[in-house]
From Swiss-Prot:
Cofactor(s) needed for function: chlorophyll a; all-trans-beta-carotene
Family matches, as InterPro entries: PS_antenna-like (IPR000932), PS_II_antenna-like_sf (IPR036001)
Keywords on record: Chlorophyll, Chromophore, Membrane, Photosynthesis, Photosystem I, Stress response, Thylakoid, Transmembrane, Transmembrane helix
Subunit structure: Under iron-starvation forms a complex with PSI trimers, where the trimer is surrounded by a ring composed of 18 IsiA subunits.
Source organism per UniProt: Fischerella muscicola
Induction: By iron-starvation; however compared to Synechococcus PCC 7942 and Synechocystis PCC 6803 induction is very slow.
Chain's role: Functions as an antenna for photosystem I (PSI) under iron-limiting conditions, when phycobilisomes disappear. In the (PSI)3(Isi3)18 complex most of the harvested energy is probably used by PSI; in other PSI-containing supercomplexes a large part of the energy will probably not be used for light harvesting, but rather is dissipated to protect the organism from light damage.
Gene giving rise to this polypeptide: isiA
Biological processes annotated in GO: photosynthetic electron transport chain
Its membrane topology: Multi-pass membrane protein
Major localization class: membrane
Protein name: Iron stress-induced chlorophyll-binding protein
Transmembrane segments: 25-45, 64-84, 89-109, 203-223, 240-260, 309-329
Family: Belongs to the PsbB/PsbC family. IsiA/Pcb subfamily.
Length: 345
């Protein structure tokens, strides 16, 4: 992290992973622990939503955010978009909670049994030791991340084509996708209007392309060292890598917010409520419901779209903050300058 030529910076507990920035073993342990917490939240909140679910009220009007996703994936849904079986939701919640325990055990193992620094490890683990200015090793680690992301995209393809199918709002039922779109002109033609996709074939075909491209990129980064132009263009430091990551998350958040707000194929009306409209409150944009609901109630679509939008906004601020620090900008100088102005006035 940026220390402004002070190598003895001490980070308190609230600084998170900055405490382990130069300890690759503990850094991995922290990441596994965060994955455990995320998975625990997913499982526990699925159960919480299941305990509050009312079969006589439209799912999109109950303020749920996880059960609609599971229904869209075709779990527990019958003809007409009716929820006919909630047991799959219970099982999925349980699997996530069990997985969180396994991940938590892995985090404890890395923290208390593994080496603090992977350069002291033996065997294959030593290969994953990294330094923030080592572009080659960062490329290797990036490659492995891309492999997992690609596998995740292809899992959706497998669910759509082989494991029961997805919910199709155009026929109000779950169906298997047998002929995904593979025409690259159709898939890449969505670049300017991606949120207008209106058929599962294009959605599944897009995931095939994304999954394969991610896997190809993963293999590339594992086998090929960063090229000269990339080393010249990019800054390789903990602060810079963090800023790149936050920028990517911000972009994904803005895309998800817009897609969720307007698209009714990936976010069916039956489970999320009708599309939203953009409104402004004292120049601040937000997505508003287009149906009348009791005071204080909002559709699942409104919750998801607005949450993604505002979180993406703050991730963008984090990206800019850390990007400026990565190039050497010291925010303390701003504070000192303002204090000097106040003193002189």
């Amino acid at each position: 992290m940026q220390t402004y030529d002070n190598p003895k910076v001490k980070y308190d507990w609230w600084a998170g992973n900055a405490r382990f920035a130069n300890l690759s073993g503990l850094f991995i342990g922290a990441h596994v622990a965060q994955a455990a917490l995320t998975t625990l939240w997913a499982g526990a909140f699925t159960w919480f939503e299941l305990s509050r679910y009312q079969s006589g009220v439209p799912m999109g009007e109950q303020g749920l955010i996880l059960l609609p996703h599971l229904a869209t994936l075709g779990f527990g849904v019958g003809a007409g978009g009716q929820i006919v079986d909630t047991y799959p939701y219970f099982v999925i919640g349980a699997l996530h909670i069990i997985s969180s325990a396994v991940l938590g055990a892995g985090a404890l193992l890395h923290t208390f049994k593994g080496p603090e620094n992977l350069k002291d490890a033996t065997g294959p683990a030593r290969e994953f030791h990294f330094e923030w200015d080592d572009a080659n090793k960062l490329g290797l680690i990036l490659g492995h991340h891309l492999l997992f992301l690609g596998a995740g995209a292809l899992l959706l393809v497998a669910k759509a084509m082989f494991w029961g199918g997805l919910y199709d709002t155009t026929i109000h039922d779950v169906r298997v996708v047998t002929e995904p779109t593979l025409n690259p002109f159709i898939i890449f033609g969505y670049q300017t209007h991606f949120a207008s996709v209106d058929n599962l074939e294009d959605v599944v075909g897009g995931h095939i392309y994304v999954g394969l491209l991610l896997i190809f990129g993963g293999v590339w980064h594992i086998l090929v060292k960063p090229l000269a132009w990339a080393k010249k263009l990019l800054i390789f430091s903990g602060e810079a890598i963090l800023s790149y990551s936050l920028g990517g998350i911000a972009l994904a958040g803005f895309v998800a917010a817009y897609f969720c707000a307007v698209n009714t194929l990936a976010y069916p009306v039956e489970f999320y409520g009708p599309p939203l409209e953009v409104k402004f409150w004292y120049l601040r944009p937000y997505f508003a419901d287009t149906i009348q609901l009791p005071y204080g109630n909002y559709t699942s679509r409104a919750w998801l779209a607005n949450t993604h939008f505002f979180l993406a906004f703050f991730f963008l601020q984090g990206h800019l903050w850390h990007a400026l620090r990565a190039i050497g900008f010291d925010f303390k100088r701003v504070e000192k300058a303002l204090s000097a102005v106040e003193t002189s006035s």
